[in-house]
Amino acid sequence: MNMDHSSHSTMSSSSSMTMTMVFTNSHDTPLFSSAWTPSSSGAYAGTCIFLVVLAIINRCLVAFKASMEHYWFATHLNRRYIAIAGKSSEAGRIDTDPDAKVASLVTAQGVEESVKVVRRVSREPIPWRFSVDLPRAAIFLCITGVSYLLMLAVMTMNVGYFCSVLAGAFLGELAVGRYIQWNEHDH
């Protein structure tokens, strides 16, 4: 009998420690801190609009990163030059032919050389470059920060905040989703 009583008290104390996870539609749910607690319906609507805009910004940042990744990869592939010996300068022809792959290059010594741009088709990783990897990391930092802010908004379990984040994600994807590549390694 004593065993039943102790197991019952342990059970009731552990169940009272759990938090019920239900959505609420309270208009005074704090967002990010107690200082940001809507006090009226208008303030609540403004907070929801802010979350929609923040979710749109998140999708725009992801699309911007995908666009920059494409640009950085294309720049990497076109970075190689081969000097063409015995060729005359073709600067005049280059100006009139938009499809020309031959260009003039002025070297560090001030000598004009004719070069041919060779596109690399290899799938090896791009070498580390400060001019590429620092902006990439900064963009990723922004994406991560905004994503965590959106996650914290959803974790308030407020229906309005949750729907606002979903609406912003939908509108952002609708606007810029075509620029986002899901497989980052398939360039």
From Swiss-Prot:
Lipid bilayer topology: Multi-pass membrane protein
Q: InterPro entries, per this entry? A: Cop_transporter
Induction remarks: Expression is up-regulated by copper deficiency and decreased dramatically when the copper concentration increases. Expression is up-regulated by the deletion of ctrC.
| Cell compartment(s), UniProt | Cell membrane
- What Pfam families would the database entry show? Ctr (PF04145)
One cellular component GO annotation, for this chain's record? plasma membrane
- Gene Ontology molecular function: copper ion transmembrane transporter activity
List the PANTHER family hit by this protein, alphabetically.
HIGH-AFFINITY COPPER TRANSPORTER CTRA2, SOLUTE CARRIER FAMILY 31 COPPER TRANSPORTERS
Describe the function of this protein: High-affinity copper transporter of plasma membrane that mediates copper uptake under low copper conditions. The mechanism driving the transmembrane transport of copper has still to be determined. Acts as a potential virulence factor.
Family of this protein: Belongs to the copper transporter (Ctr) (TC 1.A.56) family. SLC31A subfamily.
Protein name per the record = High-affinity copper transporter ctrA2
Q: Which gene codes for it? A: ctrA2
